[in-house]
């Protein structure tokens, strides 16, 4: 499985690089994100396999109630990384370089305009004002959510003693 995942990730890596060799000197945002997602999947699989070898299930693991935070933490973290890949490839940080507001608004008005929600704006994101605003907003919002989850995780982790195996 590892070799297959690595081969797929490498193949998409070449597809991603090839997308930047033709009309423009940068790669396609979606191809970059697919390559990044495959890399995250490969890394996660390798980490999971390593942990299964180092800590067999019979041994168990210490528990103090933080387990309920791990799934949301991992999901939002991976979402944040994927949105970061789209942001990087689409160069949306150039459009909204300021923080915490985006050109004076928390939620840019272009996102709330129903007429902007077209496939064309997602496909041709370089000519669109909608896609950079949406991706930047989602990336920032998921970062805020990630901070809340990490704080909840840390409060839970440090407020209870670890029970023995």
Task: Identify the residue ranges that each predicted region occupies.
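Polytopic transmembrane helical bundles with strong interfacial aromatic enrichment
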Residues: 1-165
């Amino acid at each position: 499985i590892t070799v297959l995942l690595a081969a797929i990730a490498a193949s998409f890596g070449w597809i991603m690089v090839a997308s930047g060799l033709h009309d423009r000197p940068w790669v396609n945002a979606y191809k970059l994100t697919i390559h990044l997602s495959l890399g995250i999947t490969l890394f996660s699989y390798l980490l999971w396999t390593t942990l299964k070898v180092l800590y067999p299930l019979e041994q168990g693991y210490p528990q103090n109630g933080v387990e309920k935070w791990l799934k949301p933490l991992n999901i939002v973290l991976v979402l944040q990384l994927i949105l970061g890949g789209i942001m990087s490839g689409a160069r949306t940080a150039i459009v909204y370089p300021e923080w915490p507001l985006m050109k004076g608004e928390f939620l840019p008005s272009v996102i709330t305009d129903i007429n902007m929600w077209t496939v064309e704006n997602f496909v041709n994101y370089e000519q669109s004002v909608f896609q950079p605003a949406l991706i930047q907003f989602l990336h920032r919002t998921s970062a805020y959510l990630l901070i809340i989850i990490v704080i909840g995780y840390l409060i839970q982790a440090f407020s209870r003693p670890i029970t023995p195996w």
